[in-house]
Amino acid sequence: SDLKIQLRQIVLILVLGCILEGAPLWAQWRADILPGYSQLTLPMGADYSGEVVATLVRRDRTAPAERALLYVHGYNDYFFQAALGDSIAAHGMDFYALDLRKYGRSIMPHQDPFEVKDLKEYYEELRASMKEIRSEGAKEIYLMAHSTGGLISSLYLEDTKNSDSIRALILNSPFFDFNLTKAQEKVLLPLVTSVAGLFPRTIILPPLKKPHVYDQSLL
């Protein structure tokens, strides 16, 4: 009867709605700015500057591998090293990279680039990335990090007691300390910290220092 047909249509709509509502994150993957790569937006809720997202980048592949590597960039940086991802894939591993909140693909119009008050803020996107990679079939995850990403990743693994069961941490020129003399650390660091506390948006540069070509290429 017409009533039964209508009821079936209603049930079908409800079922489809539930499926779409609970759809896994992989359903949202889309083409990245790098050829042969895809990206996934990871909603991170809101912080002191408003809505926040992170971006997980994945090298395209025909089938998932059991081993995967996640790359975390450094300060004033983002993932663009396609050759690195290609090399990792050539060795039989899936390759992922994370653009942290307020960096690269994750910068939103209302945000100040790289703004952070506590490095632990980044733990959320690291955790979400691991979860997504696991959901795609990876049984082993290796973490590679550069510069400030090395500091963030090391702190994350220490604070979480490696609850994500990362097999290895690979550090590329990690930032663990300032490249200053002991005398400079005693004078400059307290001075900069004091200025930052009073004028948090002030840009401080060494005298006559010009932006590096590498910095300009990223910006």
PLM segments and residue spans:
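N-terminal cap/lid segment of alpha/beta-hydrolase-fold proteins
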Residues: 28-62
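Conserved alpha/beta-hydrolase
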Residues: 77, 89-109
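Catalytic nucleophile-loop/oxyanion-hole region of alpha/beta-hydrolase
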Residues: 75-76, 104-140
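Short beta-strand element of the alpha/beta-hydrolase
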Residues: 66-74
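The serine-hydrolase catalytic nucleophile loop
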Residues: 76-86
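Bacterial N-terminal signal peptides
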Residues: 10-22
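Alpha/beta-hydrolase-fold enzymes
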Residues: 148, 152-219
